Structure formats: structure tokens, C-alpha cells
């Protein structure tokens, strides 16, 4: 019987040892350390053009002297909530000599016309935020609301030179620089 008791105790001891989970040490945590994160999305407005040259074959005294190609101005923006609108402008630096032959003969901005997105042709006769006085045209105005703080728009421009006001314009090569620029206000 003693032997059975010893065997019983031994079995109990073995079962207890097998079922006992080893004790873990006390959990010790460090102090929390933080990381400050800063992410900046800057405001931006950009204009890209599908081409940068237009040629004209002029007919003396003619109202219809179309440009060789249309140009698309793609305006892209990312703006703050305080911005209310985005305008796109076309302008020359001087209204009296939008195009010149370099010998004193000029084509004024009032004789240069743009049709924007299939609309009527308009001369560049307005004073806009850029360029010379009476040498510009507002192509578009986009209200900036909560749903378009980031966006893109296209302005497809066709060009014409009206030579009716210049019946005595001498033959020559006339060059000029038209600038397209956007403004967010």
C-alpha cells in the first residue's frame, strides 16, 4: 500500500507539474515617447501650353487671318480654403505693338483676337493684372468652392489677326509674344 501511495503522490506531482504554467515575471513598460508629424501641401497654380508657336499667313486689309493651330492652356491648381476664384488671362506687354516688324510697323493688341473654347473672337483690349494697359483678355474665371480646391481646366484658344484697321500695313515678318497666366484670388 505504501508503494501505491507513493505512486499516487508521484502521479499527482507529475500531473500538477505538467498542468502548471510557468510563472512569468512582472510586466514593466517604458514611458511613452512621441513623434511629431508635419505634412505640408503647398498652394500651387500652374499653366502648361500644348504648343508655343502659332503662324499666320496675312492678307492685307482682311478681317480673317487665322492662326495655323489652336493651343490648349491647361491650368492646374491646389488652393487654400480662403481662395475664392481662379482666373486665366492672355496678354501682351504693350497694346500698341503686340506684333512688330522691328522697323516701326506694328499690329496692336486690339487687332489680335482669341476665341476661347469655341466662343466668339475677342480682341485683347482690356487691362488685366498682368502685361500692358489695354493689352489683355480674361479667358476664364472659375469659382473655387469646397469641392474644387484642387482641379484642372482646359482653355482651347484659336487665334485671328484682323487687318481691317491696318489697310496700309507694309509687307514684312511680324513677331510678338503672347503670354498666358493664371491668378488665384
Residue ranges and their predicted role:
Residues 20-22:
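N-terminal signal peptide c-region/cleavage motif recognized by signal peptidases
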Residues 1-11:
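Bacterial N-terminal signal peptides that target proteins for export
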Amino acid at each position: 500500500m505504501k508503494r501505491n501511495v507513493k505512486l499516487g503522490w508521484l502521479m499527482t506531482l507529475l500531473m500538477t507539474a505538467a498542468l502548471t504554467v510557468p510563472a512569468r515575471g512582472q510586466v514593466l513598460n517604458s514611458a511613452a515617447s512621441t513623434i511629431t508629424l508635419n505634412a505640408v501641401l503647398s498652394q500651387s497654380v500652374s499653366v502648361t501650353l500644348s504648343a508655343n508657336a502659332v503662324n499666320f499667313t496675312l492678307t492685307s486689309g482682311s478681317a480673317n487671318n487665322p492662326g495655323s493651330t489652336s493651343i490648349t492652356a491647361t491650368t492646374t491648381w491646389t488652393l487654400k480654403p480662403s481662395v475664392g476664384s481662379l482666373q486665366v488671362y492672355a496678354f501682351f506687354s504693350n497694346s500698341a505693338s503686340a506684333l512688330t516688324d522691328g522697323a516701326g510697323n506694328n499690329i496692336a493688341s486690339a487687332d489680335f483676337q482669341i476665341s476661347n473654347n469655341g466662343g466668339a473672337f475677342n480682341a485683347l483690349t482690356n487691362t488685366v493684372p498682368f502685361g500692358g494697359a489695354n493689352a489683355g483678355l480674361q479667358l476664364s474665371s472659375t469659382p473655387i468652392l469646397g469641392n474644387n480646391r484642387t482641379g484642372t481646366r482646359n482653355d482651347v484658344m484659336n487665334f485671328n489677326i484682323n487687318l481691317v484697321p491696318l489697310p496700309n500695313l507694309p509687307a514684312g515678318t511680324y513677331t510678338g509674344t503672347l503670354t498666358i497666366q493664371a491668378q488665384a484670388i
